[in-house]
Amino acid sequence: MARLPCGIYFETYDKERAYIRTKPQALFLVLFFIGLLVAPFLLSVRFVSMMNLTMITMICIVGLQITTGYAGQLNLGQSAFMGMGAFVASSLTVHFHLPFYLAIPAGGLGGGLMGIIFGIPAYRVKGFYLALTTIAAQIIFPILIMRMPASIFGGSMGFHLDPATFFGISLDNEFKLYYLVMPCTVLFVGFAFNLVRTRIGRAFIAIRDNDIVAEMMGISPLSYKTAAFFIGGSFAGVAGSLWALYIRYIAVDQFTLWYSVWYIGMIIVGGMGNILGAILGTVFIRSLEEIITTLGPYLSQHYPQIGGGAIWLAGMNIILGGTIVLFLIFEPKGLVHRWKILKASYRIWPFPYS
């Protein structure tokens, strides 16, 4: 009980705004980061692979949370921004032999610039019409890649990449790639947590709540809406660069509108307007996908009457879509709302939370 904070325990605003406000929080974070460092030594290759894919997706979803959850700009082109980052990084790696630690930021810049191009109309349109504008990114992206000379973006064949190397070490397996993906994820998620606490983050929230009032207060909607798309696109571009280095083959059919819709679904499940919500939503949906993928072949083998792989592919989409609908109906604030209730209950234990 001596370690449990209760009542009014913040004496200054700085303490209230601090990242780590209690000793249990500090202990949890230390154990969490130790767990991240030793995880590949304790887990199977398949589980490490799942963690790598989840963390790459997480970077993309955190960027989408900044654009949509904080700035209120509905973005259905995140997959295209991710694809642009992947193709830029791959082109620089294959044609110019740029090392991965330079190709990844370049991919982020490519995704961010594409975000600016399709984010500028956000100054004039919003809601449904803005969604249509960002869908245009998904339509234009594959046409652009296919029409450009194959010597630039690989054309219809895409790119085959060699394993990245770092000081002579080839990053050619899940274990080694984990120690590339994990630090990048920690860096960008940490940046996002800090960003939304700054003046820029508060401006995003003001524009989301009421852009007219925000403009009257001296906030430039054009500047901040464009910045939101640039930041979100940059996160997606970095995720795309990591994706390309991870699977070592990319093509335009890996970055379709379908994935952009699922990305929106992840922040709905996790909770809009909260970086932790993006993290929880990504982990939840990716874990659910893995469970369905694991159970599908087993059930098809033991119960052949239910159908084969195609049935389970359709079933996965139905289950994931149904999950999102259930969250919209029964938990519209997402998993992060449950987490906040859990924290509040912990702080006042043994008294009931109401």
Where are these regions (language model features)?
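Transmembrane alpha-helices and adjacent helix-loop boundaries
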Residues: 1-354
